Amino acid sequence: ALRHIANQDKKVAVIFHNYPPKNSNIGSGLGLDTVESIRRLLVNMQERGYKVDFIPKDGKEFIELLTRHATNDRSMLNDRQLAEANKITGKEYGDFYHTFEQPVQEQLKKDWDEAPGHVMEYDGRLLVPGTMDGNVFITVQPPRGFGEDPSKIYHSPFCAPTHQYIAFYQWIRDIWKADAVIHVGTHGSLEWLPGKNAGLSAACYPDLTLRELPDLYIYNITITGEGIQAKRRGAAVLDEHLPAPQSQAGTYEELEELEKLMDEYVHFQRTEPDNLPRLAEMVLAKAKEANLDNEVTYDESKPFDDYLTELHNYICDLKNLEVHTGLHILGEPPLEDGLTEYLWLLTRLDNGAIPSLNQTLAGQYGYDYYYLLENSSLIYEPLNLTFNMLIDKIGSQCREVIRILQDHDFAEEGIAQVLRQPWVQEAAKQAPAQIQIGASRTGQDAATQAEPLSFLERLEMVCGYICHTIYPNLMLTTDEQKTLIRGLEGEYIWPGPSGAPSSGGADLLPTGRNFYGVD
């Protein structure tokens, strides 16, 4: 039916998640800037002819707009908001309630009293919070319930949703007569309501609540199981989005100073052993200052070198962790420095037969990258660097490679320019054909085949994969917004696999697909 309704006549309900039900939690969604994403969707909808009366200039104005109207936050509701809010009358809900199967009516009565209950009830009517924007109703999903343990209720397979929860969807579907709903972000509660796991019936609350209303669901590509639940039990068409941007944690202040002291200690073991006791005291003091004395404990009965190795490895692991640097905005590909970091993130592990960039560049020194990580206090003799410092050098080289490709718009000339770099040419002369120290964790990757590729061949392979596959697919992130428009206009939404692109799954891209699970 959607493709036969003019855009200007379509009614669309946009439902933000709101758990716990406070104004400060409006728009919660794993890794997604939900508010800015929907603000941009409103722009796109208006351009396509949907009736959108106003578009907030930014996320702050959007939230201010939503909280001027009724929300789920009962502590913030005032008389004006209560009076102006949409409501469903006791009779309207009662007529619907009496169509439910008898066991459903009895459970609702047991859990939440006689219809219409007392949750979000106002003079015998049930509140429907939200803000009307032309033919777009922007609202928040009602709480599953209230009580001493709301988190338990959220996923409870036994506790019925409140009368107001059911009435909320009834109002959207049957009274306001929405043509479609969009659930925003990972994840809401509708697909977790009581009922059968598959093959739902009229006695199952997801079906009872949503019925036949088309359901578009913006979902994080990495959360496979819950997404499949939304499809199977909520009849949702998913619009998968990229995870939040990430970068290496790195070090700061005390950790940076401690790391420098440890590297000095390793070098002094060979050059100035008389200074080691004083340097050991400085390492212990700095570790305590950085609050690491409980994370890595020093046992005086054991050699200090054992403690130093453990501390070195701990900090090396810590600084190489991936941390979130912000939220993803639906339809916005990573750009500039963010693109550099994202491409590095997507190539830090092997992608099938494509060797990781980290592993490739570690190979020029004859080492497995993970061996370096696990033995960060050892010395790489040719450069007189600790493995920790060598890892930093490899990281800088990874970024340099990607930036050269960026500067050449990911064209073939960029790959050629990488291969012409003096340090690359020098590495090609010195690098062994195979990793000599530390077995690769990934088994038969491109660096350890029966007929091993040269260092230059491996590097060219990674660069080619970045330029010809990863980068073009990342730029198709714009499909995430287009998918919603396609869905609202009754067009087919292309399927795609789900998983973590950064865990050797760069081939899962592009996003903006109706994802399915893969083994």
Language model regions located:
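Ligand/cofactor-recognition surfaces for anionic moieties
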Residues: 1-519
